[in-house]
């Protein structure tokens, strides 16, 4: 079988958004390259490739893909070169591409994300595995913003908390939280395809029994407070999310934010402050920032 490979040349900041556009256009697999895995790319230059099966007539889809990539700039996102290129690839190349780019990745000392088709075994008894189907959209769990999110979860969770995962995507953060002892998890995503992908990934990970996954726009209409709210999303979505958080965060609870490129950190901090939240700690990975925040108290 032949596949059509569509590659968008971009920068790190836009990688997740472009992956979503390509998935929504009918891609069956996404491959992300940046300087950490491809020597020919330097700095924050990145490439997102999507593989479409023969049954999809890709040239028909290209104008909309191009238009949606360009529209990202309207949300304040830098897209870099933004060029879109087509290539036919044979099945064998595709199989090799998966193997090359989706390797088990140790996110933290205790959590490793593993493509579902590998037989990777933990190297020690404390290493827990997050099994993900790499054919599904919304990240394989190896993006730096996901790394930061999992690191922040590991820093604040002690077990037994209630957690809300906003923009769950592949469900990776909910699976990580379940491994860290959280049983009461609500996972939401505005996109039904993402919710379906998350549910399928929950089924691959026995630890996730009982997670509620539903389509929802941010936290509109959600009731019932949580100890931890985690959101790895673009700043353009985090800004309207933040004012919804204080009503849903228990006293002493944490809001964990990732998906923030360094240039957008100031606007996120301003929005947090205007809504009675303060930054307890910030984590950095490349150009990305993760913020551990909590409600301000009288002592602050
Ligand atoms: C960068 S992905 C994060 C996926 C996953 N949580 C992770 O950390 O790898 C962002 C997700 O947010 C979702 N999203 C975007 N806007 C949203 C909204 N208004 N409400 C809920 N989810 C949203 C997207 O569909 C996407 O799945």
Swiss-Prot record:
Gene3D superfamilies: Vaccinia Virus protein VP39. It comes from the Bacteria. It catalyses: L-lysyl-[protein] + 3 S-adenosyl-L-methionine = N(6),N(6),N(6)-trimethyl-L-lysyl-[protein] + 3 S-adenosyl-L-homocysteine + 3 H(+). Its EC number is 2.1.1.-. Keywords: Cytoplasm, Methyltransferase, S-adenosyl-L-methionine, Transferase. InterPro entries: Ribosomal_L11_MeTrfase_PrmA, Ribosomal_PrmA_MeTrfase, SAM-dependent_MTases_sf. It holds the Pfam family PrmA. GO terms for cellular component: cytoplasm. PANTHER family: ELECTRON TRANSFER FLAVOPROTEIN BETA SUBUNIT LYSINE METHYLTRANSFERASE. Belongs to the methyltransferase superfamily. PrmA family. This is Ribosomal protein L11 methyltransferase. It comes from Latilactobacillus sakei subsp. sakei (strain 23K) (Lactobacillus sakei subsp. sakei). The gene is prmA.
């Amino acid at each position: 079988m032949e596949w059509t490979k569509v590659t968008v040349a971009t920068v790190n900041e836009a990688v997740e958004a472009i992956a979503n556009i390509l998935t929504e256009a009918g891609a069956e697999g996404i491959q992300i390259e940046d300087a950490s895995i491809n020597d020919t790319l330097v700095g924050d230059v990145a490439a997102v490739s999507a593989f479409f099966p023969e049954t999809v007539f890709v040239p028909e889809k290209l104008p909309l893909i191009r238009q949606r990539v360009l529209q990202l700039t309207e949300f304040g996102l830098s897209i870099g070169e933004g060029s879109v290129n087509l290539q036919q690839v044979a099945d064998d190349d595709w199989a090799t591409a998966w193997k090359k780019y989706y390797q088990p990745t140790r996110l933290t000392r205790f959590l490793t994300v593993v493509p579902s088709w590998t037989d990777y075994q933990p190297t020690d008894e404390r290493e827990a595995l997050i099994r993900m189907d790499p054919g599904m959209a919304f990240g394989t769990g190896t993006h730096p913003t996901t790394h930061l999110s999992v690191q922040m979860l590991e820093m604040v969770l002690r077990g037994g908390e209630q957690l809300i995962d906003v923009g769950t995507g592949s469900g990776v953060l909910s699976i990580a939280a379940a491994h860290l002892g959280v049983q009461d998890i609500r996972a939401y995503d505005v996109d039904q395809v993402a919710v379906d992908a998350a549910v399928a990934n929950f089924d691959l990970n026995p630890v996730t029994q009982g997670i509620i996954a539903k389509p929802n726009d941010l936290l509109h209409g959600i009731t019932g407070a949580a100890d931890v709210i985690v959101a790895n999303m673009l700043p353009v979505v985090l800004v309207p999310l933040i004012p919804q958080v204080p009503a849903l965060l228990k006293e002493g609870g944490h809001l964990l934010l990732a998906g923030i490129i360094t240039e957008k950190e100031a606007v996120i901090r301003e929005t947090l402050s205007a809504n009675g939240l303060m930054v307890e700690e910030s984590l950095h990975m490349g150009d990305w920032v993760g913020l551990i925040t909590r409600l301000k108290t009288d002592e602050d």
